[in-house]
């Protein structure tokens, strides 16, 4: 039986996924299990190391998270139990004493980097980038002695967890960006209807031809399904 007191999320502490987890009422007093990848989060649920997992499914700027969508399509035995929206606000952080003019190398998750590209080109046009597994991991790595990065792009809450200095606030190119997260668990766990339930489906068309997608979508319209 899955441990109902454990929730898996993409860590380490300070990620946007952790902010989504903070919205889950049933997880307020639960143990948090940080993992490195979406697949690890799903595996934690399947192996019953975690009761539920919080993973990103869609970003308003970058679109769907392919790793999550592929996992939902190919993994049997899991279902979605909830969704949570997290506003995406990025800060540029560094170790105390670092100045913005001294920044040459920036580390962050590729998705975060893409959403701050305009600001970076305008304010740090000669910088280079080091990709990280998460924005929080990029920030945490700054505190290591052999860190190659001078600064990191991370969630504004990152300074609540690590001793870092904010060099620039709200550097995202789209100030209204948000990421949608889903809460997944084993499909054999019954739940009551909430009256606000949503159904997600994955469709594979039998052939590739003009109008195929339209014909499929017309089935929803004909039956009054939004």
Q: What does each model-identified segment do?
A:
Residues 1-226:
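Domain-level signature for soluble enzymes in the chorismate/prephenate branch of the shikimate pathway
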């Amino acid at each position: 039986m899955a441990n109902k007191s454990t929730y898996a999320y993409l860590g380490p502490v300070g990620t946007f996924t952790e902010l989504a987890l903070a919205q889950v009422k049933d997880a307020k007093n639960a143990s948090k299990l940080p993992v490195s990848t979406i697949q690890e989060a799903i595996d934690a649920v399947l192996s019953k190391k975690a009761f539920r997992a919080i993973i990103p499914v869609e970003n308003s700027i970058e679109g769907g998270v392919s790793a999550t969508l592929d996992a939902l399509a190919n993994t049997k035995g899991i279902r979605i139990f909830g969704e949570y929206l997290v506003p995406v606000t990025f800060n540029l952080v560094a170790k105390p004493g670092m100045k913005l003019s001294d920044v040459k190398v920036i580390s962050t998750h590729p998705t975060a980097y893409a959403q701050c590209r305009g600001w970076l080109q305008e304010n740090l046009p000669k910088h280079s980038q080091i990709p990280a597994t998460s924005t929080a991991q990029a920030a945490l790595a700054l505190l290591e002695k052999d860190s190659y990065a001078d600064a990191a792009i991370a969630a504004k809450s990152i300074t609540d967890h690590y001793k870092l200095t904010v060099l620039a606030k709200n550097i995202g190119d789209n100030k209204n960006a948000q990421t949608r997260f889903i809460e997944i668990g084993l499909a054999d766990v019954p739940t009551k209807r909430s009256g606000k339930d949503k159904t997600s489906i994955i469709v594979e068309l039998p052939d590739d031809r003009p109008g195929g997608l339209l014909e499929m979508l017309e089935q929803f319209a004909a039956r009054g399904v939004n």
